[in-house]
Amino acid sequence: MASRLTPLTLLLLLLLAGDRVTSDMIVGPGNLQEGESEGDSQKGGILDGESIQGNEDSPTLPITNLTVVPATVTKPFSQPATEPVQSTIQPTAEPFCLAPVTSCSDSEIRSAEAVLGEALTDFSLRLYQDFSVLKKRETNFIFSPFSIASLLTQILLGAGGETRVSLEHLLSYPQNFSCVHHALRAFMSEGFTSFSQIFHSSDLTIKDTFAEASQRLYGSSPRPLGNDSTASLELINDWVAKKTNLRIRRLLDSLPEDTRLILLNAVALSAKWKIAFDKGRTSTKPFHLKSSAIKVPMMNSKKYPVASFTDRTLNRPGGRLQLSHNLSFVILVPQTVKHHLQDLEQALSTAVFKAVIKKLEMTKFHPTHLTMPRIKVQSSQDMLDYFDFIYDVNLCGLTEDPDVQVSGIRHQATLELTESGVDATAASVVSVARNLLLFEVQQPFLFLLWDQQHKFPVFMGRVYDPKG
């Protein structure tokens, strides 16, 4: 394994397909997936508290074809033809489809940044809790709440009606959080980079207001795809490979025929350990699972600066290690090998999570005898069943076409942590305390990469097997 901290790359892919929608959407039994009941088709994980197990290992994006049965339309009032009357229906307090806000003052952006940090933290923990339940037990996973939220927030530029309300609720945003796009842009740092791109079929007209707002706020304008599906597939996969530094070389093997709109977001981590580990001290040691132990390469340091404490509520130790560019690597690990990560996950409420992070940020770094494994984590999940706004989406601000519906969402992530750091000699200037602290990571643990400036998790996950 190369001795370096390789860029962590993530990709969130959103496909939208066109199916004729004339009125209320009704899913016919003939269009359900094998083993799925009619009631299952309308479930969503985060909004209503119910979750559906997705096929997390599927190599291609699932496409849900909907058979739409027109509903009978009746007028709310019956009036004689000879006596026309004025409508008694009052206009709504706000427009059905809000125009994108592309200008915010500095004070508005600063205020939005504080709100966004809190919202991303709430969103992150709810996603983690859903993943920890739906993923197979004792398996690794990693995701970027920042990447997922960035793409869903970009959709907000063109969302209207209930779709907009549902998205804001899902992301823990206040209603009409118009300066969120500027706040997201302000969250960019040298430690990680976010890329967005929209591809669409040539027959789908994108509104100029959306294209202009997307370019100004996210740095990309929608790009049309040609009629050659092979060339379109190559164009998309090339974009993915380039933006993820070849960590994800081929996301899609084929493009569904009815795909009309593809939204992509990739996040690449360039931060490294602020203080490198000595590769000469890395040795093979046991990593304890529930009923066995495996041998893995363990990085060791007798005087590594760690901010750590044992939380009374969780009764579990937590530690924070410094990365470059104002980022931290936070670890929550069971207290002993007799305790299990699942118990920690169940006890980690939003209030407890925020309290732990706050305590770790307030705790000073001390020279610590640190033992932790090299890490290699890869994860892929189909996000379609996590969100319930997607079943009848309103993208009136993005296109005039009412037929566009979401058919697939996929998220991919990889992480590899080794000894390499920004300053390979900095460890030599750390003095050894008389009472040396001990922080050992030799069993399954929860981790997150924390942005110290804006107070939110960029990445989050768990490790059961450090070898991946």
Curated annotation (Swiss-Prot):
Organism (species)? Bos taurus (Bovine)
Protein known as: Factor XIIa inhibitor
- The protein's recorded glycosylation sites are 65, 176, 227, 326
Its biological purpose is as follows: May play a potentially crucial role in regulating important physiological pathways including complement activation, blood coagulation, fibrinolysis and the generation of kinins.
Q: Which residues form a coiled coil?
A: none
Keyword terms of this UniProt record? Blood coagulation, Disulfide bond, Fibrinolysis, Glycoprotein, Hemostasis, Protease inhibitor, Secreted, Serine protease inhibitor, Signal
Further information in the entry reads: Could be the ortholog of SERPING1.
Entry's Gene Ontology molecular function annotations: serine-type endopeptidase inhibitor activity
Presence of keyword Secreted: yes
Residue(s) at site: Reactive bond: 434-435
Region annotation (Disordered) maps to 27-60
Question: What is its subcellular localisation?
Answer: Secreted
Cross-referenced Pfam families, in alphabetical order? Serpin (PF00079)
Q: Which cysteines are joined by disulfide bonds?
A: 97-396, 104-179
Q: Which GO terms describe its biological process?
A: blood coagulation; fibrinolysis
Q: How is it modified after translation?
A: N- and O-glycosylated.
The signal peptide, as residue positions, is 1-23
The record's comment on protein family reads: Belongs to the serpin family.
Record-level GO cellular component terms: extracellular space
